[in-house]
């Protein structure tokens, strides 16, 4: 299958997917999101793939989040339609049967931070930084993933403030499993993925399912709570409002 926005490689039981829009910090356009979703489906259907690595192209960013210029041009109806598609793709990543390792080669902001929080494991380097920015721009996300990773008090702090989390802090609070030099990111990830791939696939997948569903309240229930809140009294703002300063400062891409 040919891709325009991602790169796909497979060897030794491990698939590697690279977000490939470095010119816009690997912003998550809908075409990229759908290609990523299709690649995950491809991995799930292939018994030769035992583990998956997801990373970003370039040295600056894993992903700077949603493609704001793309979203700003849409009507509210189209935003909601595409938002549903994005939500389904995010859910698919979070519940992928096979273990997913995120290689965070740079900043993970907004939707990029949400995507990173759905991975089973995260490996970062000195360039890795997180920002969970939804509240800053009049939206809500990551409520159903982040607290399971770093605990409720810290999740509240990061979601309420949208502040930057540098690599060392991310490792200390559990947002990163491993922190290594940038030059060792991919080799560390591949070694870990190959170790996982040596184990019985059905058992690894069963462990993942049990861990994810054993959090007292299932991810599905927590995500539904988030969706219900956003479709009721807390309507997300349109990108033209939430990202007005960004759009005014950056203008249209050339």
Predicted regions and their residues:
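Terminal peptide-recognition signature
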Residues: 17, 21, 36, 54, ...
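C-terminal alpha-helix plus adjacent terminal tail
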Residues: 1-12, 46, 59, 162-168, ...
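Hydrophobic alpha-helical segments typical of transmembrane helices
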Residues: 85, 89, 142-145, 154, ...
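Hydrophobic alpha-helical membrane-association signature
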Residues: 32-35, 82-85, 185
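Hydrophobic helix-cap positions at the C-terminus of alpha-helices
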Residues: 39, 43, 93-96, 196, ...
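Glycine- (often His-adjacent) and acidic-residue-rich active-site loop
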Residues: 56-92, 108, 218
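Crotonase-fold acyl-CoA enzyme core
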Residues: 91-201
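Conserved CoA-thioester-binding segment of acyl-CoA-metabolizing enzymes
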Residues: 1-55, 91
């Amino acid at each position: 299958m040919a891709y325009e926005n991602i790169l796909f490689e497979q060897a030794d039981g491990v698939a590697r997917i690279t977000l490939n829009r470095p010119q816009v910090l690997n912003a998550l356009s809908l075409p990229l999101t759908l290609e990523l979703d299709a690649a995950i489906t491809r991995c799930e259907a292939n018994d030769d793939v035992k583990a998956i690595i997801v990373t970003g192209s370039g040295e600056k960013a894993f992903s700077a989040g949603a493609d704001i210029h793309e979203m700003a041009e849409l009507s509210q109806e189209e935003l909601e339609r595409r938002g549903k598609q994005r939500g389904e793709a995010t859910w698919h990543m979070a519940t992928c049967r096979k273990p997913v390792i995120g290689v965070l080669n740079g900043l993970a902001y907004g939707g990029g931070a949400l995507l990173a929080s759905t991975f089973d494991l995260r490996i970062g380097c000195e360039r890795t930084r997180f920002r969970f920015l939804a509240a800053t721009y009049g939206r809500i996300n990551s409520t159903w993933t982040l607290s399971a990773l770093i605990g409720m008090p810290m999740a509240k702090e990061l979601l309420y403030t949208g502040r930057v989390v540098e690599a060392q802090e991310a490792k200390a609070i559990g947002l990163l499993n491993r922190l290594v030099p940038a030059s060792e990111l991919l080799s560390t990830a591949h070694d870990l993925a190959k170790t996982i791939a040596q184990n019985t696939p059905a058992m690894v997948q069963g462990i993942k399912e049990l861990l994810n569903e054993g959090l007292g309240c299932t991810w599905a229930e927590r995500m539904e709570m988030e969706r219900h809140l956003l479709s009721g009294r807390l309507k997300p703002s349109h990108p033209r409002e939430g990202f007005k300063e960004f759009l005014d400062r950056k203008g249209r891409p050339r």
